[in-house]
Amino acid sequence: MAEKETPLTAVKVEALVVMKIIKHCSQTFPTTATGSIVGMDVGGTLEITNSFPFPVLEVPSESHFENAPTNPAAAAPRAKGNAAYQAEMIRMLREVNVDANNVGWYTSANMGNFVNMNVVENQFFYQKEMNERTVALVHDVSRSSQGSLSLRAFRLSPKFMTAFKENKFTSEELQKSNLRYQDIFVELPVEIHNSHLITSFIHQLQTPNIPTPTELPPSLAALESGPFVNSTILAPNYDNLTLSIDPFLEKNCDLLLDSMETHHTETNNFQYYQRSLAREQQRISAWQQKRKQENATRATLKQPLLPEDEWQRLFKLPQEPSRLDSMLNSRQVDQYARQVDSFVSATTGKMFAVKGNLLPGETTK
């Protein structure tokens, strides 16, 4: 193992591990899938060489268990029942001479909605109880279905770990520590590694040759549907002119609006707390002023003074709500905004191209 003073700079995942994670997450989609990852730390690079899924304890609908999680799979990494299972799996891997160091866990996501309390609590449990140098791999099944693999590695920042351990998420504490929603996670670059034999085999694969048409097309319809479409680079392709908005982009916009509404609700709750606190402080100030006047009168009459700290028993200041939920929601809004920004470029160009047909008064009769 590398020295703890060497910071983690990257995550290297074996291709077989990536395939196992993709298969597990795709089979359980749209429900959450979680599992453990093992490997070793080499010079600040976390090499992940194997993985295995966590068993999920399904709670019957008619059960009356207290504190039963609403999503057992999401809470599986920190479940007590999985600790023995994970230790037994690592022991078996060690017996067959496989890297058996616990380096983190993985989870599935849908449309980038991985910024939640379950992920934070799981990663906090791993960095605090298991090993400080652990990561969480997040595989977005919906994003990967668009054609590009979405596999990201995250860790909780030391600043957020300290605040979460002390459960200090009040406005005063956040200002003192300068903790922002951008400081919740630290993302590490992910590299997918193949063995030399697999890399050599991939380079030896030959691309099948496309037969070249020998006869000219008799009509335009034959040109659009014949072999010229696949062989000619400049063949007409009208699919690029379609105005249908990507459903992934449309769903992201809906989720972004929902997160913004949640942020608005959290802001209203905090403003209500501030108004309630201001009212109580005014009442306390008025009571203290009245008590001082009474004590001044009693002092002139040489009577015993009344206690001036009695307001602590008579008045109760409202408790400030935790700002953790608001921070997580802000980080989720940022995640949705980044996804929309990455997908909006192609659609925006098409919308500007037909601007005259979309806006009234822009077309000429």
Swiss-Prot record:
GO terms for biological process: formation of cytoplasmic translation initiation complex. The keyword ATP-binding does not apply. It holds the Pfam family eIF3h_C. GO terms for molecular function: metallopeptidase activity; translation initiation factor activity. Keywords: Cytoplasm, Initiation factor, Protein biosynthesis. CDD domains: MPN_eIF3h. GO terms for cellular component: eukaryotic 43S preinitiation complex; eukaryotic 48S preinitiation complex; eukaryotic translation initiation factor 3 complex. It is found in: Cytoplasm. Residues 11-160 form the MPN domain. Component of the eukaryotic translation initiation factor 3 (eIF-3) complex, which is involved in protein synthesis of a specialized repertoire of mRNAs and, together with other initiation factors, stimulates binding of mRNA and methionyl-tRNAi to the 40S ribosome. The eIF-3 complex specifically targets and initiates translation of a subset of mRNAs involved in cell proliferation. Belongs to the eIF-3 subunit H family. Component of the eukaryotic translation initiation factor 3 (eIF-3) complex. PANTHER family: EUKARYOTIC TRANSLATION INITIATION FACTOR 3 -RELATED (PTHR10410). This is Eukaryotic translation initiation factor 3 subunit H. It comes from Aspergillus clavatus (strain ATCC 1007 / CBS 513.65 / DSM 816 / NCTC 3887 / NRRL 1 / QM 1276 / 107).
